[in-house]
Amino acid sequence: MIPKLLSLLCFRLCVGQGDTRGDGSLPKPSLSAWPSSVVPANSNVTLRCWTPARGVSFVLRKGGIILESPKPLDSTEGAAEFHLNNLKVRNAGEYTCEYYRKASPHILSQHSDVLLLLVTGHLSKPFLRTYQRGTVTAGGRVTLQCQKRDQLFVPIMFALLKAGTPSPIQLQSPAGKEIDFSLVDVTAGDAGNYSCMYYQTKSPFWASEPSDQLEILVTVPPGTTSSNYSLGNFVRLGLAAVIVVIMGAFLVEAWYSRNVSPGESEAFKPE
C-alpha cells in the first residue's frame, strides 16, 4: 500500500512541477486491450500500455481521472499491463495511458489515443442479416445489416465485430434503427463469424448484447491463386534478368579495362 501511495504521489508531483506534455521529447504511448475492447459483464480485460522509452513509470486514466487501482506491472521493456477483473457496466468508458521518467527531470509524455472499453449486455440484442446467401466469391461485396429493437433518444453508434479481432472492424452512426456495413473486394481473410452491437457514444456508454453470429464464407475461384503466383514469378524473373544484364555489362567493362595494353591506350590519345 505504501509503495503504491508513493508512486501516485511522485506522479502528481511530476504533473505539478515538471509537466512538459506535448514538447515532443517523449513518444506517445499506445494502449491496447486483450482479449477485446468489447466484452460481456463479469469478464476480465488486460489493458497494455507500451512505449519505446525505457526507465519510465506508467499511469492509467479513465475519462481523464487517474485510476489508483489496479497497480500496473512495471517493466524495463517499456510496457505495463493493467488488469481489470470482473468488469461491470460502470467500468465502461474512455481509457488513456501515459508515462513519466523515473529519473529527474520527471518529463511527462503525451497521453495515448483513447481506447473505448465497452461492457455489453445493458441494452437489448440487435439482429444481423446479410443480403447474400451461401458463399461469396473473392473480389465480391458483402452487405451486413444490423437492426436494433430499442428506440433510443440518445446518440448511439453501431459496431461490426469479427470473432478473433480485438476491436470493432467498422463503426457507423445510424440515421434510424438500422445500418448497413459493407465488406468490399473480399478476400479469403474476410471469412469468419461476424456480429454487431450498438452503444451510447457518451457516458455511461451503455452497450447492447452482441447479435447472434453470422458466418461469412469466401470462395476463391480455381486458378486465381495460381495466376497471381505466376504473375509474381514473371515479375521476379524480369527483375532478375535486368540485374544479370547490368552485372554482365560491369564485368565486360572490367575485363576490357584489364586487357587493354598501355600502348593501345596511348594510341587513342590525341597528338
Curated annotation (Swiss-Prot):
Ig-like C2-type domain sequence ranges: 27-113, 126-212
Topological relation to the membrane, as annotated: Single-pass type I membrane protein
Location(s) in or outside the cell: Cell membrane
Gene Ontology terms: biological process: adaptive immune response; immune response-regulating signaling pathway; innate immune response; negative regulation of CD4-positive, alpha-beta T cell activation
GO cellular component terms, semicolon-separated: plasma membrane; specific granule membrane; tertiary granule membrane
Cytoplasmic side: 258-271
Keywords per UniProt: Adaptive immunity, Cell membrane, Disulfide bond, Glycoprotein, Immunity, Immunoglobulin domain, Innate immunity, Membrane, Receptor, Repeat, Signal, Transmembrane, Transmembrane helix
Cleaved signal peptide residues: 1-16
Gene Ontology terms, MF aspect: immunoglobulin receptor binding
Protein name, entry field: T-cell-interacting, activating receptor on myeloid cells protein 1
Organism field: Homo sapiens (Human)
Name of encoding gene: TARM1
